[in-house]
């Protein structure tokens, strides 16, 4: 028998959920565009090789990959950064810099569904291409922070780490597989301490190396507390230069007015192999089992890997499936109104009655009132019962006798009161009552 149920890890989004999403998308879009980012949308699927080049081992394992009818290896996009980088390489290498793009789109990963994690999920994000300066990092992290503030979230932190410092740390430990170590550190929050220590030993670290890693991931907190510790730990010129850059980044974020939410966490790696220096993620305390609600970082080598000229870039993605449950849990989403403000009921089967009902409905709609009309031909009592179940505040009754007198009836569904109004002034009167 054919399977006609919903595929595991996906969801049917009903009107109330869609209304919440639309509200969140609108708030985020306003902030993105306020920073002069412009919207783009790439294909839902790309050649699989695009994602295999630098997305990271974990993401590659989770690809929805298949061959099309032409035998080409295709994958649904697991993230947008690779696709946007490909778009840039294909068409915009000679465009004026920086390029500031944003997207709101669905992604696909074959992973185990859990709280805030699905196999089809939505992200809102930006990519800033063409600047290697700390000002670009500050612009992107400030936008990241203000996007959460725009939807009413205030109890969260933006934790900033640095892949250059992690690379340096791997060298200090004598680890050749620095990417492997970063992947392991990135998974630390998904393991108990004992499991993490065991994984470090399996990776080949001795007791001293394990202790150093455990010490590193505890170096986190306010920038003025953490960065001096980093200066003591790292001694190479490259590391010192990067710490100096972090000091400047924090200073610029203060000018943006978002330093209240900023923390430094040297144990952040992020899961994608294409990050090259600054990385960051947002965490909002909750009882829902949801961890990071978004993140990003600088990826200065990815465009070159895709065949383009060396071009610095940075960006982030906000996880919508993680953000919305937290907003609901905190009571930050607005009350969703799905009912119409006015329901128009033509009584009987007379054509002029139907036409008048349509004209009134359309007049209200043109005035931006949410208006609906009875379409099933049911009896008046059943139509009124239906309007009552919807919670409609006002009903317009259009009957043949009233119409012959140039009238229609307006019914207040809460009080049950009815009054006769001029047909020609019906829309105007209803608008006055609604305060439109």
Curated annotation (Swiss-Prot):
Top EC class for this record: ligase
GO MF annotation, one: histidine-tRNA ligase activity
Keyword match rRNA processing: no
Reactions accelerated catalytically: tRNA(His) + L-histidine + ATP = L-histidyl-tRNA(His) + AMP + diphosphate + H(+)
Superkingdom to which the source organism belongs: Archaea
Keywords: Aminoacyl-tRNA synthetase, ATP-binding, Cytoplasm, Ligase, Nucleotide-binding, Protein biosynthesis
Keyword Lipid metabolism tagged: no
Disulfide bonds: none
Biological processes annotated in GO: histidyl-tRNA aminoacylation; L-histidine biosynthetic process
PROSITE patterns on file: AA_TRNA_LIGASE_II
CC annotations in GO: cytoplasm
EC number, as in UniProt: 6.1.1.21
Compartment annotation: Cytoplasm
Family from the record: Belongs to the class-II aminoacyl-tRNA synthetase family.
PANTHER family per UniProt: HISTIDINE--TRNA LIGASE, MITOCHONDRIAL-RELATED, HISTIDYL-TRNA SYNTHETASE
Record-given protein name: Histidine--tRNA ligase
Native species: Thermococcus kodakarensis (strain ATCC BAA-918 / JCM 12380 / KOD1)
Taxonomic classification: Archaea, Methanobacteriati, Methanobacteriota, Thermococci, Thermococcales
């Amino acid at each position: 028998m054919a399977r006609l149920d919903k595929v595991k890890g996906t969801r049917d989004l009903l009107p109330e959920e869609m209304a919440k999403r639309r509200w969140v998308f609108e708030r985020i879009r306003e902030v993105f565009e306020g920073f002069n980012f412009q919207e783009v949308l790439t294909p839902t699927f790309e050649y699989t090789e695009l994602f295999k080049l630098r997305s990271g081992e974990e993401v590659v394992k989770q690809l929805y990959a298949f061959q099309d009818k032409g035998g080409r290896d295709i994958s649904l996009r697991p993230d947008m950064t690779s696709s946007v980088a490909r778009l840039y390489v294909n068409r915009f290498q000679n465009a004026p810099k920086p390029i500031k793009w944003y997207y709101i789109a669905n992604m696909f990963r074959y992973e185990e569904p859990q709280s805030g994690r699905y196999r089809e999920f939505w992200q809102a994000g930006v990519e800033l291409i063409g600047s290697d300066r700390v000002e670009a990092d500050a612009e992107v992290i400030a936008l990241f922070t203000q996007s959460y503030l725009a939807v009413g979230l205030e109890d969260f932190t933006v934790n900033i780490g640095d892949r250059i410092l992690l690379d340096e740390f791997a060298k200090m430990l004598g680890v050749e597989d620095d990417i492997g170590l970063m992947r392991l550190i990135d998974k630390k929050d998904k393991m108990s301490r004992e499991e993490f220590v065991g994984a470090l030993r399996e990776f080949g670290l001795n007791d001293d190396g394990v202790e150093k890693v455990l010490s590193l991931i505890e170096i986190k907190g306010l920038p003025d507390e953490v960065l001096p510790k980093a200066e003591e730990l790292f001694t190479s010129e490259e590391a010192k230069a990067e710490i100096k850059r972090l000091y400047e980044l924090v200073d610029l974020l203060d000018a943006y007015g978002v330093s209240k939410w900023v923390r430094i966490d040297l144990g952040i790696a992020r899961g994608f192999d294409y990050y090259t220096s600054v990385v960051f993620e947002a965490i909002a305390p909750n009882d829902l089992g949801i961890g990071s609600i978004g993140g990003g970082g600088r990826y200065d080598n990815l465009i070159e890997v895709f065949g383009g000229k060396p071009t610095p870039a940075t960006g982030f993605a906000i996880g919508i499936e993680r953000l919305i449950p937290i907003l609901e849990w905190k009571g930050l989403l607005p009350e969703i109104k799905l009912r119409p403000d006015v329901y128009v009921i033509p009584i009987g089967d007379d054509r002029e009655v139907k036409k008048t009902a349509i004209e009134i409905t359309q007049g209200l709609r043109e005035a931006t009132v949410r208006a609906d009309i009875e379409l099933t031909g049911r009896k008046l009592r059943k139509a009124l019962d239906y309007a009552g179940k919807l919670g409609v505040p006002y009903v317009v009754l259009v009957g043949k006798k009233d119409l012959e007198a140039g009238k229609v009836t307006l019914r207040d569904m809460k009080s049950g009161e009815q009054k006769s109004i001029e047909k020609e002034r019906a829309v105007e009167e209803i608008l006055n009552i609604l305060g439109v």
